[in-house]
Amino acid sequence: MTERNIHVQPASGLAVEDQDIEVVERKGIGHPDTICDGIAETVSRALAQTYIDRFGTVLHYNTDETQLVAGTAAPAYGGGEVLEPIYILVVGRATKKFDGERIPAESIALRAARDYLDEQFPHLDLGSDVIVDVQFGEGSGDLQTVFGEEAAIPMANDTSYGVGHAPLTETEQIVRNTEQKLTGEYAESNPVVGQDVKVMGKREGDHIDVTVAVAMVDEHVPDLDAYKTAVSDVRAFVTDLAEEYTDRDVTVHVNTADDYDAESIYLTTTGTSAEQGDDGSVGRGNRANGLITPNRPMSMEATSGKNPVNHIGKIYNLLSTEIAQSVANEVDGIRQVQMRLLSQIGSPIDEPHVADATVVTEDGVAVGDVEADIQATIDDELADVTDITRQVIEGDLSTF
């Protein structure tokens, strides 16, 4: 094993699964903040791949300041209309000229952003419901980093940190899978469900409350009774889904702000609240593992859109999560591991200033019994840090 600064220590408190109160949130792919995350990351991958294809290197860029300004809509039973379009501004920096060649960075970004919206949002008319704009400052050619050269370890661009944890608790699994399956397989056969699905899980002792906000699509809602049926169907689906992950009691609540007497309901024309007064920004929603987990250490860094070569705010959050998963899967006797990686600007990213694992072990297993195995697993993952860059560019790792 190398001389990397790796620490392993026992956690001072209970595993999250054993705490009295647990809160978990996920903002779905159609939430305005997550729309920004998705576009920023898609544009990031497109730029990185273009640079590799043309120059064999990932040049300097960042797209992690993407913003969304909500539109205005008039939803109605059977189908309403968008009155003022959603405005999306892809903001950042990109290298537009390198080695004597000009690079159409803005055009690449615009195409990637529109392709993402077209793929993810079937109820959004790209011709009239949304405006996509791109504003890139010039990146620095001096900050280029060669990607793909064996033994080339990038230097950290910042003194910053990333965090990750494993395994997911029952509540975390329920929350993440509820959104992913509602906006995935369920929405495919039930198009009344829009892409803006927000899920909040609260576990109090052995009872889990799952509160789901679902943007219903007005085109598929002819009247209030049909809306009520759609809400009831979602509730039943999520209840059955939750039972796959827990034996605890689960209560599912759907669109709790509805007032049926006043016919004030969560009805949308496009399937996202971005059509009506809900703005968005990169990094204000899900962390790198797709969840918001106030019971856990979290980084405030926006992971999506950052350069995947040496930007610590991206790499260390993704790597911390991968390390935690590897430790939980490969080392016997681990009940919970929470990982922190701290960089120092200018140092190789495979040599963090400190790599710290805080561990809860199973009954009868002391941390000292497994410390060497944990350190070895962390060391192996750090040695392979550049694989995070490859996975991100190829789209194998999600950042939101």
UniProtKB/Swiss-Prot annotation:
Alphabetical keyword list: ATP-binding, Magnesium, Nucleotide-binding, One-carbon metabolism, Transferase
Coiled coil: none
InterPro entries associated with the record: AdoMet_synthase_2_family, AdoMet_synthase_3, S-AdoMet_synthetase_arc
Disulfide-bonded cysteines: none
Binding site for ATP: G137, E138, G139, S140, G141, D142
Pathway: Amino-acid biosynthesis; S-adenosyl-L-methionine biosynthesis; S-adenosyl-L-methionine from L-methionine: step 1/1
Domain of life (superkingdom): Archaea
Gene3D superfamilies according to UniProt: 3.30.300.10, S-adenosylmethionine synthetase, C-terminal domain
Gene Ontology biological-process entries: one-carbon metabolic process; S-adenosylmethionine biosynthetic process
Enzymatic reactions: L-methionine + ATP + H2O = S-adenosyl-L-methionine + phosphate + diphosphate
EC numbers, comma separated: 2.5.1.6
Cofactor or coenzyme needed: Mg(2+)
UniProt-recorded Gene Ontology molecular function terms: ATP binding; magnesium ion binding; methionine adenosyltransferase activity
Family, as annotated: Belongs to the AdoMet synthase 2 family.
PANTHER family: S-ADENOSYLMETHIONINE SYNTHASE
Protein function: Catalyzes the formation of S-adenosylmethionine from methionine and ATP.
Name the record gives this protein: S-adenosylmethionine synthase
Originating organism: Haloarcula marismortui (strain ATCC 43049 / DSM 3752 / JCM 8966 / VKM B-1809)
